């Protein structure tokens, strides 16, 4: 079916609106947090004491919040006039194309926000009342990113925090809090977070930020005209390409913490990700300028965007396999 012939508010329209390719960025941090918790709990207590309930809830919460963020971005970019079809270089968007009506998108934003809250509420049982604060902050920043913060060049920092530190560390935290080992001393304090977990979360955030850098690199001329001062706009083209390359290198270098904690494969396997990352960087570097061919530029950049999403998934799988393979 031609995308221009999609029936409004149809199942296919909503599927496109969820932006399935972005979901790897939501899943990978949680999967890494789960793998870290499973590894530590198995070695300290035994695999039978790992609780899958909070793990599944964290994964569902991440998926719903990512879809919620995509809906919010779709709606507000349309409302602010930032999705002009003639200027747009990226994939087409639901509201702008009329695939989803504005009223339906508003309802979808409200519904996914409620679903995220419902999915997240049981985590209070495992992680305590502080999980309420975590959930509220996640929801608030979903709205603030599109409406304000992305225009201030804070997008990359938010990705590091909300696609790295928060999901990895919080997932690890709530799973470890769920351990009910029968012989624990009353004054026992579980490892709610370790340096391995924190550095792994930073590495994950850097990898996911590569996706945002490619997206903003593609759109930098339009963003500059719209007054959207992303980090790419501030750095310029050459330094942005250097930033993209550095994100992958630093993320893999941080993986030395896995080796130091007895998980050599979790350090070695991400080399596969790094090879793919460098290949994507070479494509960015060799792309024809936008001024020469708008169509060729858009095609190359969107291809790089798809590769960046794939690379995130490859990185996550390499780390997860590396953490679990020795158990």
Where are the regions a protein language model picked out?
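Acidic (Asp/Glu-rich) catalytic motifs at the cytosolic membrane interface
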Residues: 64-89, 210-232
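Topogenic membrane-insertion module of multi-pass membrane proteins
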Residues: 1-57, 61, 155
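Membrane-embedded alpha-helical segments that form the functional core of polytopic membrane enzymes
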Residues: 31, 44-75, 132-143, 190-214
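Multi-pass membrane catalytic core of lipid/isoprenoid biosynthesis enzymes
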Residues: 85-126, 228-263, 306-313
């Amino acid at each position: 079916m031609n995308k221009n012939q999609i029936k409004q508010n149809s199942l296919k329209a909503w599927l496109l609106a969820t932006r399935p390719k972005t979901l790897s960025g939501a899943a990978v941090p949680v999967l890494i947090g789960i793998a870290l918790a499973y590894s530590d709990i198995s070695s300290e207590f035994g695999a039978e004491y790992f609780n899958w309930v909070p793990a599944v809830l964290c994964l569902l919460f991440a998926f719903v919040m990512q879809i919620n963020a995509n809906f919010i971005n779709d709606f507000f970019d349309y409302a602010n006039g930032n999705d002009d079809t003639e200027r747009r270089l990226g994939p087409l968007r639901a509201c702008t194309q009329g695939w989803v009506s504005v009223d339906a998108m508003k309802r979808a934003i409200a519904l996914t926000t409620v679903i995220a809250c419902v999915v997240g509420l049981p985590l209070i049982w495992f992680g305590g009342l502080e999980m309420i604060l975590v959930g509220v902050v996640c929801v608030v920043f979903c709205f603030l990113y599109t409406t304000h913060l992305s225009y201030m060049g804070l997008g990359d920092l938010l990705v590091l925090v909300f696609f790295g530190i928060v999901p990895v560390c919080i997932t690890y935290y709530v799973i470890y809090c769920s351990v009910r080992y029968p012989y624990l001393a009353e004054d026992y304090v579980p490892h709610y977070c370790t340096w391995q977990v924190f550095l792994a979360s930073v590495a994950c955030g850097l990898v996911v930020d590569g996706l945002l850098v490619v997206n903003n690199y593609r759109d930098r001329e339009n963003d500059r005209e719209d007054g959207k001062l992303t980090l790419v706009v501030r750095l310029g083209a050459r330094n942005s390409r250097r930033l993209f390359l550095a994100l992958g290198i630093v993320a893999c270098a941080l993986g030395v913490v896995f080796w130091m904690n007895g998980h050599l494969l979790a350090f070695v396997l991400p080399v596969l990700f790094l090879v793919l990352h460098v290949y994507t960087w070479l494509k960015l570097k060799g792309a024809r300028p936008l001024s020469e061919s708008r169509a060729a530029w858009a095609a190359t950049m969107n291809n790089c965007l798809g590769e960046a999403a794939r690379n995130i998934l490859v990185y996550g799988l390499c780390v997860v396999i590396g953490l679990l393979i020795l158990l």
